[in-house]
Amino acid sequence: MNIATSLTLTGLAISAAIFWLNFRPWWKGSREPKALIPFGSGFALGAVATVCTGGLLGWLAGCSAGVANSAGERGVRAVTGAAGSGALARGDLGQLTPEGAVIVFLMTVGVFLAWKAAGKQDKKRMAGGGFCGATLCVTAGVASLLNWLPGSLNTAGEQLRAAVEGAGIL
């Protein structure tokens, strides 16, 4: 994981607010599962970005917690006058293999293409999902809930490699 900053309680408040701003219209509206796809795809990419040890995704994930903490500190202080709190318990999703990294790359391309085709509102939801995924997955609780994700990516990459190399086909 390429994240030097732990999420603070005020950073969590910002992530929770962004999550609620994206979830509430769906809850109050039709509750169609397909309406969650923009936020969910962004969240998934943000979550896997925390597993990246470098590159653009790793850098963006590393910056997200710091941005959330800074914005949360200012927001909470402006609204309540109270000072911020210490860092929350850190979590780690695990490691990517080279095969898993290929799956993350393909996933990034897919989300980027969806971003290019999306309308303004869906782009906001995708960005919010990415931010929430990158910030919440550095906490111990969310990382524990999603600890299956890197293994799934690595396995999918290994299966892709085996299929391309001809192992186990027919």
Task: List PLM regions with ranges.
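Structural signature of hydrophobic alpha-helical transmembrane segments
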Residues: 1-14, 92-104
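Hydrophobic, membrane-inserted alpha-helices
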Residues: 106-114, 130-133
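Alpha-helical transmembrane segments of multi-pass integral membrane proteins
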Residues: 139-170
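N-terminal signal-anchor/start-transfer transmembrane helix
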Residues: 8-29
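Hydrophobic alpha-helical membrane-insertion segments
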Residues: 41-62, 131-147
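Interfacial/capping segments of alpha-helical transmembrane domains
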Residues: 56-75, 145-156
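Alpha-helical transmembrane segments and their helix-start/interface "positive-inside/aromatic belt" motifs
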Residues: 24-49, 119-131
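Hydrophobic alpha-helical transmembrane segments
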Residues: 81-108, 167-170
